[in-house]
């Protein structure tokens, strides 16, 4: 669950009760200039989901350098992988998924000793690839299907490696589009009221 700072939690968050965990996403583009674990703890942050990899590259040196302070404060850390599904095609998506998960697993081994505090996560996106691939391929039925197949392959690989299904970390739009039967026990909101 994400806790919206300084506001009364929305009704759907309150429904989880006092046992709910509240967390943040920290990636290279949304990191504060300095991580202050005591400020996070004071604001009831229980966990932080950290982007360790994106596509075929490692991506978050900033947070990795500060993981020790966060862990010693009692904040749980969970790695996530931001996939580059838009680089996959029908004939190579399994190979591409394997390569991405090999890099992600290597980073989990390196920074978590292979045992993260929480289950590794996959950031499920629309297939938008930034400046080089500005048009989401998910706008077509074929693109949507490939996007889902790619992410399912990522999930299969992670389950084989870690013995648990990964968390799927995504925006509300994807939950409605792709995960209508998903467990509502996890809720993430970004930039919404």
What feature does the model see in each segment?
Residues 159-179:
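Aromatic-lined carbohydrate-recognition surfaces of secreted/lumenal glycan-active proteins
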Residues 4-161:
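Substrate-binding cleft of extracellular glycoside hydrolase catalytic domains
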Residues 106, 149, 183-193:
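Acidic, His- and aromatic-enriched active-site or binding-groove loops in soluble protein domains
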Residues 88-96, 175-186:
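Glycine-rich, charge-decorated loop segments at or immediately adjacent to ligand/cofactor-binding or catalytic sites
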Residues 77, 164-166, 185:
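Hydrophobic anchor at the start of a short beta-strand
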